[in-house]
Amino acid sequence: MGALAAAIAIGLAALGAGLGNGMIVSKTVEGIARQPELRGALQGTMFIGVALVEAIPIIAAVIAFMVM
C-alpha cells in the first residue's frame, strides 16, 4: 500500500509541476513577444520560477521514498 501511495504522490507532484512549468514558460514567451527588450529580465525570473516549481516534485519524491 505504501508503494501505491508513493506512486500517487510522485505522479500528482509531477502533473502539477508540468502544468506549472507550462504556464510559466508560456507567459514568459508571451511577455517576450510583447516587450523583446525585457528578454533577459523575463528569462531570469522564469528560471527562478521554474526552479521553485521543480522543487515540489523533488520534495514529494523524497517524502514518498521515506514512506515506503
Curated annotation (Swiss-Prot):
It is found in: Cell membrane. GO terms for molecular function: lipid binding; proton-transporting ATP synthase activity, rotational mechanism. One of its GO terms (cellular component) is proton-transporting two-sector ATPase complex, proton-transporting domain. Gene3D superfamilies: F1F0 ATP synthase subunit C. The chain crosses the membrane at residues 5-25, 47-67. InterPro entries: ATP_synth_csu_bac/chlpt, ATP_synth_F0_csu, ATP_synth_F0_csu_DDCD_BS, ATP_synth_F0_csu_sf, ATPase_proteolipid_c-like_dom, F/V-ATP_Csub_sf. Signal peptide: none annotated. The keyword Ion transport applies. F-type ATPases have 2 components, F(1) - the catalytic core - and F(0) - the membrane proton channel. F(1) has five subunits: alpha(3), beta(3), gamma(1), delta(1), epsilon(1). F(0) has three main subunits: a(1), b(2) and c(10-14). The alpha and beta chains form an alternating ring which encloses part of the gamma chain. F(1) is attached to F(0) by a central stalk formed by the gamma and epsilon chains, while a peripheral stalk is formed by the delta and b chains. F(1)F(0) ATP synthase produces ATP from ADP in the presence of a proton or sodium gradient. F-type ATPases consist of two structural domains, F(1) containing the extramembraneous catalytic core and F(0) containing the membrane proton channel, linked together by a central stalk and a peripheral stalk. During catalysis, ATP synthesis in the catalytic domain of F(1) is coupled via a rotary mechanism of the central stalk subunits to proton translocation. This is ATP synthase subunit c. It comes from the Bacteria. Keywords: ATP synthesis, Cell membrane, CF(0), Hydrogen ion transport, Ion transport, Lipid-binding, Membrane, Transmembrane, Transmembrane helix, Transport. Pfam families: ATP-synt_C. PANTHER family: ATP SYNTHASE LIPID-BINDING PROTEIN, MITOCHONDRIAL, ATPASE PROTEIN 9.
